[in-house]
Design a protein with these regions (language model features):
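Non-catalytic protein-protein interaction segments used by genome-maintenance enzymes to assemble
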Residues: 88-171
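Metal-dependent nuclease catalytic regions and adjoining charged, substrate-binding loops involved
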Residues: 154-160, 167-248
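Hydrophobic (often cysteine-bearing) scaffold residues that line and stabilize catalytic clefts
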Residues: 2, 6, 35, 62, ...
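C-terminal, charged and often intrinsically disordered regions of DNA end-processing helicases
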Residues: 1-16, 107, 237-248
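A residue-level signal for conserved active-site and pocket-lining positions in enzyme catalytic cores
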Residues: 6-7, 70, 116, 166, ...
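Residue-level recognition of the N-termini of beta-strands and the immediately preceding loop/turn
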Residues: 85-87, 128-129, 177-182
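Secondary-structure transition/capping motifs at alpha-helix termini
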Residues: 16, 20, 77-84, 103, ...
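A non-catalytic, helix-rich entry segment at domain boundaries
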Residues: 8-97, 202-205
Length: 248
């Protein structure tokens, strides 16, 4: 429930309003206004709306925690010091790929839901960010090689794999955009709340440089999944099952 409330409140707080078109420009001044006492009341009204949306009873503890987390989100955005153009919140994306399944080829839909799609300008470059909110503990936002993303083990950077997957889907919809996959760990300290993903200490602000290799590895994974000669086995990393809703 906590994650549901946070995501819904963040969505309504940032999404385009009836007076906007398909985009909404969030200014640093607006973000600063949300950090005032009146802004706190505005935030909590969005949280209460989220409870109603989830058809859940309000919980003062959850309201307090989500308020603090939304304020952290707002501070992270305000720290950019530039306008943020919101292109979408909780945006559904989909594409179709052809996968070899044994002796035949099948069409497989790839579907995702992006927490936030926005556009900012950094050092004169217009960047479209694909942001995935994370309310859990802080993870390393850097990766070493493709095995780090695709080989299932205790050190697998599955959260980076997820946002790369979203970026691949978005690339099909916005082929000309300079896409930057981002992870925003809300719990982390302010100084470590950099949402960008790094490879060999280099910030990824153009997913196109990695897209082809990622697509090839994803294709291999999908063909393993759909290969009828291979057993459909559970993950060997049982620690991943601790929070699985199907564990029981």
């Amino acid at each position: 429930l906590f994650g549901t409330i946070f995501h819904r409140a963040a969505e309504t707080l940032y999404q385009p309003t009836a007076t906007d078109t398909h985009e909404r420009i969030i200014t640093p001044q607006y973000l600063q206004s949300l950090l005032t006492d009146q802004g706190r009341r505005t935030i909590q009204e969005h949280i209460r709306q989220a409870f109603r949306y989830a058809q859940a009873n309000e919980d003062v503890v959850t309201i307090a925690i989500v308020t603090r987390y939304l304020q952290r989100l707002i501070k992270a955005d305000a720290a950019l010091g530039c306008p943020i153009t919101i292109l979408g919140t909780e945006k559904d994306v989909k594409t179709i790929v052809t996968v070899k399944a044994g002796e035949e080829e099948i069409k497989v839909p790839l579907i995702g839901n992006i927490d936030r799609l926005d556009r900012i300008t950094i050092d004169g470059q217009e960047i479209t960010r694909i942001i995935d909110y994370k309310t859990g503990s802080k993870k390393d936002n850097s990766w070493k090689d493709w095995d780090n993303l695709f080989v299932p083990n205790a050190k697998q950077a599955y959260y980076i794999l997820q946002t790369f997957y979203y970026s691949l889907l978005m690339q099909a919809e916005m082929p000309q955009a300079q896409l930057a996959p981002c992870l925003l760990f809300i719990q982390s300290e302010e100084k470590s709340r950099d949402p960008f993903i790094y490879h060999d200490k280099e910030r990824i602000i153009n997913f196109a440089e990695y897209a082809e290799e990622f697509r090839a590895h994803l294709q291999t994974l999908l063909e393993e999944i759909y290969d009828p000669s291979l057993p459909f086995a559970p993950t060997p990393v049982t620690d991943h099952c601790r929070t699985c809703p199907y564990a029981e």
